[in-house]
């Protein structure tokens, strides 16, 4: 009887250790981009990154069953839909996106109503409203919000979170510490994400100076 009790304690300790390790390795973040995928557990996830996050926390027990929302959510599930934001907030309507990227790429539904992009149209249909917080008239603009998004990566995580980052198609050049000019800060962030060993950071707004310009700047500094 004593041996059985000791064995039970050992199993509990091993389980707790595995759980703690999983939590440590599953601390990466995901972008709030609504590109739903269906998990093998019948749950809909905002995007493939959120599915990988849930799978990581369940010891890789969830796989991607297909693109788009699941046909139905299991009635026995007592937990809310895992369609959440990176801050942990959950959508008020199961399976509906909480937010969309502030990118102007207008689309119209079957009734001719125009939305700023596909995500806002899907949000309105899902919630049964005409909601389109990003609706614009006149000259379209692009928020810098998505350019400022960052992902936290867990040590040893083997997934490709950099591939889930999306950038606006706007030209707001910045100069990187590697001497390269990037279309915008978000594009620089993706390159930095894909090449962490280079530790690329933004050194200034606008294109990087050419070699000739650098030489002229050095000459002017020497004269001073």
UniProtKB/Swiss-Prot annotation:
UniProt site positions, description: Reactive bond: 32-33, 102-103, 169-170
Induction note: Expressed in zoospores. Expressed during host infection.
Pfam families xrefs: Kazal_1 (PF00050), Kazal_2 (PF07648)
Disulfide bond sites: 26-56, 30-49, 38-70, 96-126, 100-119, 162-193, 167-186, 175-208
Gene3D superfamilies documented for this protein: 3.30.60.30
Biased composition (Low complexity): 71-92, 211-224
Glycan attachment sites: 25, 199
Any one of the GO CC terms: extracellular region
Gene Ontology MF, one: serine-type endopeptidase inhibitor activity
The Kazal-like domain, residue ranges: 23-72, 90-127, 156-210
SMART domains, per the entry: KAZAL
InterPro entries: Kazal_dom, Kazal_dom_sf, Prot_Inhib_GrowthFact_Antg
Ranges for region Disordered: 69-92, 202-224
CDD domains on file: KAZAL_FS
Signal peptide: 1-22
Keywords: Disulfide bond, Glycoprotein, Protease inhibitor, Repeat, Secreted, Serine protease inhibitor, Signal, Virulence
Function as written in the Swiss-Prot or TrEMBL entry: Secreted effector that interacts with and inhibits the pathogenesis-related P69B subtilisin-like serine protease of host tomato. Inhibition of host proteases by a pathogen extracellular protease inhibitor forms a specific type of defense-counterdefense mechanism between plants and microbial pathogens.
Oligomeric form and interacting partners: Interacts with host subtilisin-like protease P69B.
Protein name (Swiss-Prot/TrEMBL): Extracellular protease inhibitor 10
Natural source organism: Phytophthora infestans
């Amino acid at each position: 009887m004593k041996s059985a009790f000791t064995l039970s304690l050992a199993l509990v300790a091993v389980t707790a250790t595995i759980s703690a390790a999983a939590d440590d390795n599953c601390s990466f973040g995901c972008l709030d981009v609504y590109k739903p995928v269906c998990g093998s557990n019948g749950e809909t996830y905002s995007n493939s990154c959120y599915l990988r996050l849930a799978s990581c926390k369940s010891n890789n027990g969830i796989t991607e069953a297909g693109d788009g929302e699941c046909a139905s959510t299991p009635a026995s599930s007592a937990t809310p839909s895992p369609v959440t934001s990176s801050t942990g907030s959950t959508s008020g309507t199961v399976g509906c996106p909480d937010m969309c990227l502030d990118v102007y790429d207008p689309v119209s539904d079957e009734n001719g109503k125009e939305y700023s992009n596909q995500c806002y149209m899907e949000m309105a249909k899902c919630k049964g409203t005409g909601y389109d917080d990003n609706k614009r008239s006149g000259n379209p603009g692009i928020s810098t919000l998505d350019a400022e998004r960052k992902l936290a990566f867990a040590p040893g995580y083997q997934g490709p979170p950099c591939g889930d980052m999306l950038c606006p198609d706007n030209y707001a050049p910045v100069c990187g510490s590697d001497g390269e000019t990037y279309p915008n800060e978000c594009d620089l962030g993706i390159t930095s994400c894909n090449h962490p060993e280079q530790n690329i950071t933004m050194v200034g707004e606008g294109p990087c100076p050419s070699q000739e310009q650098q030489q002229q700047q050095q000459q002017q500094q020497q004269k001073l």
